[in-house]
């Protein structure tokens, strides 16, 4: 999730 949109699992 780090650095990515909160809606994505990563």
Curated annotation (Swiss-Prot):
Its main location: mitochondrion. It is found in: Mitochondrion inner membrane. Liver and heart specific isoform. Pathway: Energy metabolism; oxidative phosphorylation. One of its GO terms (biological process) is oxidative phosphorylation. It is a single-pass membrane protein. Keywords: Membrane, Mitochondrion, Mitochondrion inner membrane. It comes from the Eukaryota. One of its GO terms (cellular component) is mitochondrial inner membrane. Component of the cytochrome c oxidase (complex IV, CIV), a multisubunit enzyme composed of 14 subunits. The complex is composed of a catalytic core of 3 subunits MT-CO1, MT-CO2 and MT-CO3, encoded in the mitochondrial DNA, and 11 supernumerary subunits COX4I, COX5A, COX5B, COX6A, COX6B, COX6C, COX7A, COX7B, COX7C, COX8 and NDUFA4, which are encoded in the nuclear genome. Component of the cytochrome c oxidase, the last enzyme in the mitochondrial electron transport chain which drives oxidative phosphorylation. The respiratory chain contains 3 multisubunit complexes succinate dehydrogenase (complex II, CII), ubiquinol-cytochrome c oxidoreductase (cytochrome b-c1 complex, complex III, CIII) and cytochrome c oxidase (complex IV, CIV), that cooperate to transfer electrons derived from NADH and succinate to molecular oxygen, creating an electrochemical gradient over the inner membrane that drives transmembrane transport and the ATP synthase. Belongs to the cytochrome c oxidase VIII family. This is Cytochrome c oxidase subunit 8B, mitochondrial. It comes from Oryctolagus cuniculus.
